[in-house]
């Protein structure tokens, strides 16, 4: 078992109690980030869930040139630092270009490799050299077994603080499904490194030719329960006070007001599954 320790209170591992990587999709404003973080911290502390705040400073892969991308690197780091200073929690954000890695790592406790960029060697090496823990998003077009090649790149570049994340797999055009058997494959080929599940991005669904993703928010609880029943290191989640007004991926976002009952169910599943004795079936 390989664990990744992010703080004295947050250790990410497949056999450890699950860690929540939760926040908002894109950093819309300082006030919204702090409002969301406050609710996440309240609920996770009440339920005893290790917690990392998530927010993107730039959504560089938006489908439309007219879509909101975020506040940018400088302002985004100020917002993430404000969350850290106010609530004392680790933070995670995604990096899209090699030159961004070093300044992001000055603030972020976890740097994220976006799914669409997971095979970009220059970016992998730049993230590895930060010395920070890295969350590797498995591309929608990549089989679970192929994640081994991405892991090998990071290890060769000198960084073994790796977390692997599944965010769904393409099923034909404009649709994603979650392969529940894939989680175990990712654990196996990586030497049992922590594997987490991005439930909200897995709910994306797009109408052909649409400029923005739709989503299946109503099914977020059932998909999260199913994923956590496998036995995972963590859950990756995005919520919003008013998903209809979110500037990115609102149709997949959990309403922030439902965070506590949602996480109570997820934690109950995680606690139950990890109370079982290991069962080896050859």
Swiss-Prot record:
Give the EC number(s) under which this enzyme is classified. Answer: 2.5.1.55
Output the Gene Ontology cellular-component terms.
Answer: cytoplasm
Q: Say if the entry is tagged with keyword Cell membrane.
A: no
Q: Can you state which reaction this protein catalyses?
A: D-arabinose 5-phosphate + phosphoenolpyruvate + H2O = 3-deoxy-alpha-D-manno-2-octulosonate-8-phosphate + phosphate
Q: Which InterPro entries match?
A: Aldolase_TIM, DAHP1/KDSA, KDO8P_synthase
Which UniProt keywords are listed? Cytoplasm, Lipopolysaccharide biosynthesis, Transferase
GO BP, sorted A to Z: keto-3-deoxy-D-manno-octulosonic acid biosynthetic process
Coarse class of the primary localization is cytoplasm
GO MF terms here are: 3-deoxy-8-phosphooctulonate synthase activity
Which pathway does the record list?
Carbohydrate biosynthesis; 3-deoxy-D-manno-octulosonate biosynthesis; 3-deoxy-D-manno-octulosonate from D-ribulose 5-phosphate: step 2/3; Bacterial outer membrane biogenesis; lipopolysaccharide biosynthesis
Broad EC category: transferase
Compartment(s) of residence: Cytoplasm
Classification via NCBIfam families: KDO8P_synth, PRK05198.1, PRK12457.1
**HAMAP family attached here?**
KDO8P_synth
Q: Of which family is this protein a member?
A: Belongs to the KdsA family.
Listed name of the protein: 2-dehydro-3-deoxyphosphooctonate aldolase
């Amino acid at each position: 078992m390989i664990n990744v320790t992010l703080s004295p209170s947050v250790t990410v591992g497949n056999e450890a109690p699950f860690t929540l990587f939760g926040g908002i999709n894109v950093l819309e404003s300082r006030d919204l980030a702090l409002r969301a973080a406050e609710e996440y911290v309240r609920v996770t502390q009440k339920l005893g869930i290790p917690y990392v705040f998530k927010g993107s400073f730039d959504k560089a892969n938006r489908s439309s040139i007219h879509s909101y991308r975020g506040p940018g690197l400088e302002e985004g780091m100020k917002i993430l630092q404000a969350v850290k200073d106010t609530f004392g929690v680790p933070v995670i954000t995604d990096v899209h270009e090699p030159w961004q890695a070093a300044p992001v790592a000055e603030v972020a406790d976890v740097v994220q490799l976006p799914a669409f960029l997971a095979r970009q060697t220059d970016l992998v090496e730049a993230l590895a050299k930060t010395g920070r823990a890295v969350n590797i998003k498995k591309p929608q077009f990549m089989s679970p077994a192929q994640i081994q090649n991405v892991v090998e790149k990071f290890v060769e570049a000198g960084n073994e603080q790796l977390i692997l994340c599944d965010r769904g797999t393409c099923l034909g055009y404009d649709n994603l499904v979650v392969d529940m058997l894939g989680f175990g494959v990712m654990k196996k080929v990586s030497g049992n490194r922590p594997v987490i599940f991005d439930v909200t991005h897995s709910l994306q669904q797009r109408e052909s030719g649409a400029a923005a993703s739709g989503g299946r928010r109503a099914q977020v609880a059932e998909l999260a329960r199913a994923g956590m029943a496998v036995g995972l290191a963590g859950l990756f989640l995005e919520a919003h006070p008013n998903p209809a007004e979110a500037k990115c991926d609102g149709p997949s976002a959990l309403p922030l007001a439902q965070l506590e009952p949602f996480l109570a169910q997820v934690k109950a599943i995680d606690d139950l599954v990890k109370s079982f004795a290991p069962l080896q079936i050859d």
